[in-house]
Design a protein with these regions (language model features):
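Hydrophobic alpha-helical transmembrane segments
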Residues: 17-21, 55, 85-86, 128-130
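Membrane-embedded alpha-helical segments and adjacent helix-loop junctions characteristic
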Residues: 1-30, 34-45, 111-115
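Juxtamembrane and boundary regions of transmembrane helices in multi-pass small-molecule transporters
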Residues: 71-147
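Membrane-interfacial helix-loop connectors
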Residues: 25-93
Length: 147
């Protein structure tokens, strides 16, 4: 209990800013936001860190993962590689500014994920349907519409 309280207290500092920096630093050091997220999942499942505190860590991890692309782009010749790496970075930073910076939008991703998780626990087929829709059907429809 003391460990859980301590971790949540540290991650909750600065309105989530400390958690974002921690997520970014972990991801930069391991060069993978997937590893950072994979570390957090069992902690959330065990109740060691609250979902509200894990959320800004994952946001920081998403920014941290752009460092790898920026480093690779700096090694390339020409400006195209750096341009797209900066677009990737700014996309993630602007996502934080919009979703985390506007207080009434901040809980939206967690609420949506909690709703989807509750549905998936009751009916796995809904989770599979959501994944297929988001990653296959919707992209194919967008491609077909804008061809």
């Amino acid at each position: 209990e003391r460990l859980e309280a301590s971790m949540n207290r540290v991650l909750g500092r600065g309105g989530g800013l400390v958690a974002m920096v921690i997520g970014m630093l972990i991801t930069i050091s391991v060069q993978s936001s997937s590893i950072t997220t994979s570390i957090l999942i069992p902690m959330a499942a065990a109740g060691v860190i609250s979902l509200r505190n894990i959320y800004p860590v994952t946001l920081g991890a998403n920014v941290g993962t752009t460092i790898t692309a920026l480093l690779a782009a700096l090694a390339a010749s020409g400006s195209d590689a750096l341009t797209i790496a900066l677009v990737h970075t700014w996309f993630n930073v602007l996502g934080i500014v919009v979703l985390y910076g506007i207080p009434f939008l901040r809980p939206l991703p967690i609420r949506c994920a909690e709703l989807l998780a509750e549905l998936a626990v009751r009916r796995r087929s809904l989770a599979v349907g959501w994944v297929v829709s988001v990653f296959v059907i919707i992209p194919l429809l967008v491609i077909a519409i804008f061809r």
